[in-house]
């Protein structure tokens, strides 16, 4: 799997990390990431998916309601959030690869309240993998890698490779959170 450490330490941008990568590389990284997410769920039980973890660092600055800003995310919430973000990155990358301008967002997030079982979130990850690989397959044979956009102020410009990689970086940023939630759930189950 790709090392996002230089991005987190602000030593490199997504576009820097994307230099020299191919569409096939992105497909391989996507398979690896989804396999890591599914592996994290191997010992999870349905009750773990809806357990509200202790998360003193919870701070969702994009929450639609003020009371949700400090909400600790359940495992189900994390999975539907991260898959939606990666799918959005894949969709925007497809737009860029086709030589078109990105206008607005391309995001749909399954309501996290629907994520109540391990089977549901496993399916969500598998479905997301299929969707992202399909979007990569839809790239032209010669993608327009000179087509750049800036997602928002303060971010360096990126092309299709950088935009797609951004979704994987986002997935990576939530892997540890998934493991922490599952570990908290395991400890709670053992104590019950």
Where are these regions (language model features)?
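Aromatic-glycine hotspot motif
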Residues: 1-76, 80-192
């Amino acid at each position: 799997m790709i090392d996002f450490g230089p991005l987190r330490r602000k030593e490199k941008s997504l576009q820097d990390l994307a230099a020299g990568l191919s569409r096939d590389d992105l497909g391989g990284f996507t398979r690896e990431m989804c396999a890591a997410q599914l592996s994290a769920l191997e010992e999870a039980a349905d009750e773990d998916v809806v357990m509200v973890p202790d998360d003193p660092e919870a701070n969702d600055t994009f929450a639609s309601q003020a009371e949700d800003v400090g909400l600790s995310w359940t495992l189900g919430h994390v999975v539907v959030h991260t898959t939606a973000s990666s799918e959005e990155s894949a969709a925007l990358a497809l737009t860029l690869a086709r030589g078109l301008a990105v206008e607005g967002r391309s995001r749909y997030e399954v309501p996290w309240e629907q994520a109540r079982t391990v089977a549901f979130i496993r399916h969500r990850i598998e479905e997301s993998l299929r969707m992202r690989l399909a979007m990569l397959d839809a790239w032209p044979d010669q993608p327009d890698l000179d087509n750049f956009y800036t997602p928002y102020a303060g971010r360096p410009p990126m092309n299709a490779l950088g935009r797609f990689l951004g979704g994987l970086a986002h997935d990576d940023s939530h892997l540890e959170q998934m493991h922490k939630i599952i570990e908290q759930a395991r400890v709670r189950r053992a104590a019950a």
